[in-house]
Amino acid sequence: MWSILSIKRSTSRMELMCLNAAECPINVFPEQQRNMPTESLNPGTVLIVGGGPVGLITATTLAKYGVRSVILERNLTTTKWPKMDLTNSRSMEIYQRLGIADALRNVAVPSHYPFTCLFSSGLHADKAITAWDLPSPDEYRRRIREQNDGSMPSEPWLRVSQEIFEAWLKELGMENPLIDFRAGWKVKGARELDHGVEVEAIHSDTGEVWKVSADFVIGCDGAHSAIRKSLEIPLDGGPIHGYAVLVHFKSRDLSRIQKQGQFWHLFFPNAASDGGSIKGAVIAQDEVDTWTVHRFMRPDVDHTQLSSEEIVYDLLGGMGGQPFPIRIDEVLVRSTWTPSVALARSYAGPKHRIFIAGDACHQTVPTGGYGMNTGIADGYDIGWKLAAVIQGWAGPATLLSYEKERRPVGELALQWSKVHMGNLMKMSAELGLDAHMIELNNETGAELRGAMHSYLQTHDGHNQSIGVEMGYRYVSNICVPGALDAELSPPEFHPRKYTPCTMPGYRAPHVYLTTGTPVSRLFGDGFTLVAFPEGEGLNASTEQLREAARKKALPLEVVELPGEMHAHEVWGASLVLVRPDGFVSWHGDSVRSQEEADRIIAQASGFDSEHLGNHVQAQERSAL
């Protein structure tokens, strides 16, 4: 049975926007389905379709702001597939904001292990040909503290398999009284109405069909999203030529697997004569006994004729084709997957009652680790924005900003995942890698190995593209330009760099203060006004912005940092208005009047009618 949740409804502008879903028209689904059991979620409760990591992070974000959610998840258990194995620094910053980062590190790969990536011609050789020596989280954190110039994230990255992460995150969700997780319910479709959404769901065991009404729905239901299909949103892009076999297994035969050294990823190129490209990779999931092999196959190869053990041995043998056997204690799972690069043309329904996030709106190849991490940022973004609207301290433009801000980021992730994959895939043919010559102990062999080393050290952005992860700029109606912006030019985008900048739409730079505290730890749950009171007249500006926020019932934390000259220099403005997600809404050195302060706060919170557009104004009129 469906549980009925209750929530206190704020007396706010949301009473004009989020009408009881029970008021929505009933006859949405076909005639024969009109008599199906129906549940109307209480006003302010968000329905999330898909209980994987993106759906759970979305629910966790909503819960942080006191907003209830119901998750419909078709699977009865969490994933057994390793999938994601890198949590990048931007995701860790999000988890820190949600209060779960430290607990996640406790279940992840211990933080002293480096992220070494080896490139090998095969384990028959004594040594790998080259390596990307990427730092451990401990080393990364040390570098962040030492550098302290605003160009680094506030949190180092993390190694954790999705198999572990999803189970851990689901347990947190099940313990949260504001999250109602319902397993075994497959959503068949959704209808977006003027004042809500109707969703049809079927139980996987009983076949029972229910209709659920909610004010808002977020589709986190993967690449084959029923929610996206219900909205008839097309995908641009699709599968890439070829496929891969995944073998996830247990083995303590470390002396053979790690013959060429400890690694996080171990890559094997194909010989140029064997079609070039990458033969596959091994991922060390826990530095104990859990490994994942990805073996890329030509479309004409039938993998079912090979055992899982044969696939592993063949990959470890490298480009020479001679298998390298190891002791496999247990094969956990095996599957095939096809690389896909695709982007949804829209992230929301036309009435902005339905939104999609994660793989439902973007699919990337694994290179760079952008897929899951981009989805996590999607869920966090729509989570805080929807919570703010439901609670009345943000207006309609806030919901419009989700697609405007997040879709370009999805496009950026797709672009660079293809660049990284392309660099790996074309290496063998470009260098003319030869399985016999590459291991020769002579000048020819040394030259070929040297060429491969040089190529890979030049094309090493695979996991070092911090600009792609957090150096982008949001451009939307809730980013407020000011007088200071006329004097400045935005930093040039570079995939390998994050240039600190507090122009509207950029992530607020991380800096340690003189107390040793990261400035981001002082941010409130709502908006934060960071003030560097070094000059005269700043108190008046601060009070005007505080008063403007009070009039809009906008939660605003004012953080005054006198004497923090270094942080002030990095941030480049005396006043910076920071959103709940750590991105900048507005910056300036002063506010000239209360009227200007009111305008800044109104636009930043999505209430400024001049920046809504005719579509949203029409929606508001219909809601009235």
Curated annotation (Swiss-Prot):
Entry keywords, A to Z: FAD, Flavoprotein, Monooxygenase, Oxidoreductase
Any GO BP annotation: biosynthetic process
Pathway listed: Secondary metabolite biosynthesis
TM region positions: none
SUPFAM superfamilies given in the database record: FAD/NAD(P)-binding domain (SSF51905)
UniProt binding sites for FAD: E73, D359
EC number: 1.-.-.-
Signal peptide range: none
Gene3D superfamilies: 3.40.30.120, D-Amino Acid Oxidase, subunit A, domain 2 (3.30.9.10), FAD/NAD(P)-binding domain (3.50.50.60)
Protein name as catalogued: FAD-dependent monooxygenase apdD
Provenance organism: Emericella nidulans (strain FGSC A4 / ATCC 38163 / CBS 112.46 / NRRL 194 / M139) (Aspergillus nidulans)
Lineage: Eukaryota, Fungi, Dikarya, Ascomycota, Pezizomycotina
